A protein has these predicted regions:
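A short, charged, amphipathic alpha-helix used as a generic interaction element across diverse proteins
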Residues: 24-60
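Short N-terminal "domain-start" leader segments
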Residues: 1-26, 60
Length: 60
């Protein structure tokens, strides 16, 4: 089984994607919705950036 070190999540209150260590991510937080788990930091960072770019494009 792959150890999932990182998580990308969408925070509804601030309308933005973030990443954090999986061990620190609070699954029970009301406004945070996980979208990707991985142990590949580069993938996590790229996914977060691309998702935020899409959000910005949709807001124009």
């Amino acid at each position: 089984m792959i150890d999932k070190k990182y998580v990308v999540y969408y925070h509804e209150k601030v309308n933005e994607y973030f990443y954090d260590y999986y061990s620190r991510f609070n699954m029970n937080e009301q406004y945070s919705k996980p979208v990707l788990y991985s142990d590949d930091f580069e993938l996590i960072e790229r996914a977060k950036n691309e998702l935020n770019e899409r959000l910005q494009e949709q807001s124009y």
